[in-house]
Amino acid sequence: MDENDLKQQIDTLIRSYPDFPSKGVLFRRVNLIICLSLIKDKLSPRLGLKDVLPLFSKPTLVHSLCCYVANRYKNKIDLVAGLEARGFLFGPIIALELGIPFVPVRKQGKLPGPIISASYQKEYGKDVFEVQQGALSAGQRVLIVDDLLATGGSLHAAEQLVKQTGATVYANFVVIELGDLNGRKVLASEVDAFLTY
């Protein structure tokens, strides 16, 4: 299946839910493209929220998407880092396709042992991402994977974590980018968005 066919098929899974989770927001469900909690004033009603979970009702599309991403980065990266929680859905599949390690980027307090952390500002407060010390090594080229790019805060924190280890962010891959929010402007590395709204 070519890229345009894949994009078209995934795009058809998007569902819109007016006034969800609050009045004035249009929630679009993609059966797995993200249930992101953003405050209403940061989103235009046209953008709404995106949910990638419906995509998982079509396992062949999930596999095709992950193979597409793996082919784009073959021989260019050494490791895939997935952001909690939905980066865990795509990242391991991409890493398996490439035969390279996957590292989970977890929220604070969920990893045992020595950790490295980076904080970031969310719409409703501060949050922290962590990786275990030794999970990434200096010089490794890393693909950071998440389902959605909105304001860029979580991906920026993940970039900071990778940088602290001495590894390099090769690119950030997201299934969906909410382009009007300009989240890519806060990121130091390339953003590869499969779909942009």
Annotate each language-model stretch with its function:
Residues 1-197:
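PRPP-associated nucleotide enzymes
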